[in-house]
């Protein structure tokens, strides 16, 4: 029997200390990593529930284990809410991550050696879109497209590559691209060569749900996403589609289970259901609108301070700061900002002369600070402090002064009140 009042700090003080330190770090540091956010206490409550004890291989009503009648309800709630959120006719909420959701789609619709056309990691794509260090670039013949001199997706080049290589699948989506994507143009390109169009909307799913970013579902054969990032749920993945053919649904269902996964994580699926319910609330749309306003304010301020933003600004939640030609690298900038309690990630930029472990860029995003309650002026102030550090990354006095300002801002906007 397990006592309900058991204390981790008494049983495992080393682990309890690490968790407490992380809680403090999240409160005392400004989080600007574009893929990170804070989920609600309700999401965390469900994720830590007794549902973690239940094995439930299969799907609702068709399990390989008994005693699944309660978790069936949780999974069905997640499915129906995901469909409502994105205007989907099909949803699979079992993928453990966005990467596994992408992997499922590849394995469902492609054969090893087939050609895929995806966005280059160096130009803002994702590892799972055909990078040669990822399984997607090892099992498939991955052809990569990128951005033009203005930092925008070159649709004519994408079309030319598609006509030349005749891919079986075109992949649209990104991890570091700050403009809107023309999903219809991508579908037209895919149709020209008889390819599937897979859209990975992991970074913008929350914006899509709130109708502040174009919805890819009317154009894509299949759409994948994470459930954290802008969607502000637990770490996990989903696959959704609008009006899919029955054969496609069967392939997707059978590849997720039993194809690449066994038992689903029912505590995470239930937490997804809570997050989807939160995303259906009117306040979520207001939040996503503010995410974009804050990102625009930050990007504009950094440009006023002389820093180049790839593509000249942002239309979503993130921006990529291009520091090619400057003495400071992305790695050094990340470290200096970290000392000021501003958390960012180094990121390659188009035509980056530095290695991926050093880089000449920074990726910044506003989902987490907006969850805290930041408004445009807060992000303007924050952008100025970032520029102060980037202007003098080795100046301890500057870093200390910024750290004090960050501390005051964090006290003003606690994550969990």
Swiss-Prot record:
Disulfide bonds, paired cysteine numbers: none
Protein name as catalogued: Serine hydroxymethyltransferase
Oxidoreductase in keyword set: no
EC number(s) per entry: 2.1.2.1
Recorded metabolic or biological pathway in which this protein acts: One-carbon metabolism; tetrahydrofolate interconversion; Amino-acid biosynthesis; glycine biosynthesis; glycine from L-serine: step 1/1
Keywords attached to this entry: Amino-acid biosynthesis, Cytoplasm, One-carbon metabolism, Pyridoxal phosphate, Transferase
This protein's GO CC annotations: cytosol
UniProt cross-references to InterPro entries, sorted A to Z: PyrdxlP-dep_Trfase, PyrdxlP-dep_Trfase_major, PyrdxlP-dep_Trfase_small, Ser_HO-MeTrfase, Ser_HO-MeTrfase-like, Ser_HO-MeTrfase_PLP_BS, SHMT-like_dom
Provenance organism: Xylella fastidiosa (strain 9a5c)
Annotated localization: Cytoplasm
GO biological process, one term: glycine biosynthetic process from serine
Site residues, Plays an important role in substrate specificity: 228
Positions with a binding annotation for (6S)-5,6,7,8-tetrahydrofolate: 121, 125-127, 355-357
Residue intervals passing through the bilayer: none
Cofactor needs: pyridoxal 5'-phosphate
Recorded catalytic activity of this chain's protein: (6R)-5,10-methylene-5,6,7,8-tetrahydrofolate + glycine + H2O = (6S)-5,6,7,8-tetrahydrofolate + L-serine
């Amino acid at each position: 029997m397990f006592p309900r009042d058991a204390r981790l700090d008494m049983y495992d003080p080393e682990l309890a200390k690490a968790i407490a330190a992380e809680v403090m770090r999240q409160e005392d540091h400004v989080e600007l990593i574009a893929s990170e956010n804070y989920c609600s206490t309700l999401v965390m409550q469900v994720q830590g529930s007794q549902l973690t004890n239940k094995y439930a291989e299969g799907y609702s009503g068709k399990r390989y284990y008994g005693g699944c009648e309660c978790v069936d309800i949780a999974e069905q709630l997640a499915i129906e809410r995901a469909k409502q959120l994105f205007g989907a006719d099909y949803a699979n909420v079992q993928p453990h991550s966005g990467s596994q959701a992408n992997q499922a789609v590849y394995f469902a619709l492609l054969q090893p050696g087939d050609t895929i056309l995806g966005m280059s990691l160096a130009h803002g794509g994702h590892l799972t879109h055909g990078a040669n260090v990822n399984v997607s670039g090892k099992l498939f013949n991955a052809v990569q497209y990128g951005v033009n001199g203005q930092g925008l997706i070159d649709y004519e080049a994408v079309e030319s590559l598609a006509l030349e290589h005749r891919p079986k699948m075109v992949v649209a989506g990104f991890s570091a691209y700050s403009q809107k994507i023309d999903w219809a143009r991508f579908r037209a390109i895919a149709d020209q060569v008889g390819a599937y169009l897979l859209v990975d909307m992991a970074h913008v799913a929350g914006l899509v749900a709130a109708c502040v970013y174009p919805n890819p579902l009317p154009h894509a054969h299949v759409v994948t996403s994470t459930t954290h990032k802008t969607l502000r749920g637990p770490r996990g993945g989903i696959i959704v589609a609008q009006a899919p053919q029955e054969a496609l649904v069967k392939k997707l269902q059978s590849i997720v289970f039993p194809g690449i996964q066994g038992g689903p994580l029912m505590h995470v699926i239930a937490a997804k259901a809570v997050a989807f319910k939160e995303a259906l609330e009117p306040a979520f749309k207001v939040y996503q609108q503010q995410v974009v306003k804050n990102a625009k304010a930050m990007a504009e301020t950094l440009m006023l301070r002389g820093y180049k933003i790839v593509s000249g600004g942002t239309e979503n939640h993130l921006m990529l700061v291009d520091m090619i030609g400057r003495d400071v690298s992305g790695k050094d900038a990340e470290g200096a900002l970290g000392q000021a309690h501003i958390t960012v990630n180094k990121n390659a930029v188009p035509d980056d002369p530095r290695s991926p472990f050093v880089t000449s860029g920074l990726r910044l995003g506003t989902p987490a600070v907006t969850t805290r309650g930041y408004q445009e002026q807060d992000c303007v102030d924050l952008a100025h402090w970032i520029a102060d550090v980037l202007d003098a990354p080795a100046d301890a006095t500057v870093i200390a002064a910024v750290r004090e300002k960050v501390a005051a801002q964090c006290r003003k906007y606690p994550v969990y009140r």
